[in-house]
Amino acid sequence: MSSVKQEEVQFAPVEIRPMHDLDVPVIVAIERAAYQFPWSEGIFRDCLRVGYVCRVADVGGDMAGYGIMSIGAGEAHILNVCIRDEHRGRGFARKVLVYLLERARASGMYEAFL
């Protein structure tokens, strides 16, 4: 993970960008820090491979979190959303969720499940 201090990114805008293979090690570290039963690296790589909507919340070059969604059959499934502890409480998860829901709607999905 980056050594960017929280004070340096306090007011930095969040960019919701595509997740890439190179992001997976950091994503796995965020996942392991947040959950008692985290997803494996293989699960994240499979999500990328099959074309799920996989996005990263990037704050000034620091990966703050991520969101993953599958879409199809008229519905969207938000499978995972996680924000690193030091970035929580600043609305980043909301921005990830809004992005995912907008993407689902643009793809013609009528229902979303979390």
Predicted segments, located by residue:
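Terminal substrate-recognition subdomain of acyl/acetyltransferases
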Residues: 1-12, 105-106
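A short beta-loop-alpha structural element at the N-terminal edge
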Residues: 13-26
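Residue-level recognition of the GNAT/N-acetyltransferase active site
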Residues: 20, 84, 88
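Active-site rim helix/loop that mediates acceptor-substrate recognition in acyltransferases
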Residues: 34-68
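Conserved beta-strand in the GNAT
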Residues: 62-70, 75-82
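A short, glycine- and basic residue-enriched loop/turn
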Residues: 70, 75, 89-90, 111-113
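Conserved acetyl-CoA-binding loop-helix of GNAT-fold acetyltransferases
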Residues: 89-106
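Conserved GNAT acetyl-CoA-binding A-motif
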Residues: 104-114
